[in-house]
Regions:
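Extended alpha-helical scaffolding segments
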Residues: 31-72
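Alpha-helix boundary/N-cap detector
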Residues: 2, 23-26, 43, 47, ...
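Short terminal alpha-helical segments
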Residues: 1-33, 83
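Amphipathic alpha-helical binding modules
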Residues: 64-92
Length: 92
């Protein structure tokens, strides 16, 4: 199933800040602080987590959502870590 327009937008918002980073996994906290916690795109943390879940189960190449050099595997690992940290924060 292709990624919904809303989820694609949320994923773009999460990828954009790390497109030039050498290792996106090192930027997870920064992105959560600047994108998720500020409710960028009027989305709640749960909406971001849901969008990530949808993205990770889709067959779409997530690395193609915005022009950048990271592999699809790197982007998927990064998004999985963002989702994990959102979940940890929501459980506290």
């Amino acid at each position: 199933m292709p990624l919904s327009v809303r989820s694609a937008g949320l994923i773009r918002a999460l990828i954009y800040p790390v497109q030039f980073d050498d290792n996106p996994l090192e930027a997870v906290d920064r992105v959560i602080d600047t994108v998720v916690r500020t409710r960028s795109l009027d989305a709640t943390p749960e909406e971001y987590r849901s969008g990530i879940r949808e993205a990770l189960t889709s067959a779409d190449r997530l690395s193609d959502l915005i022009p950048q050099d990271h592999s699809d595997d790197v982007i998927r690992r990064y998004l999985a870590e963002v989702a994990r940290r959102i979940e940890v924060a929501s459980a506290q």
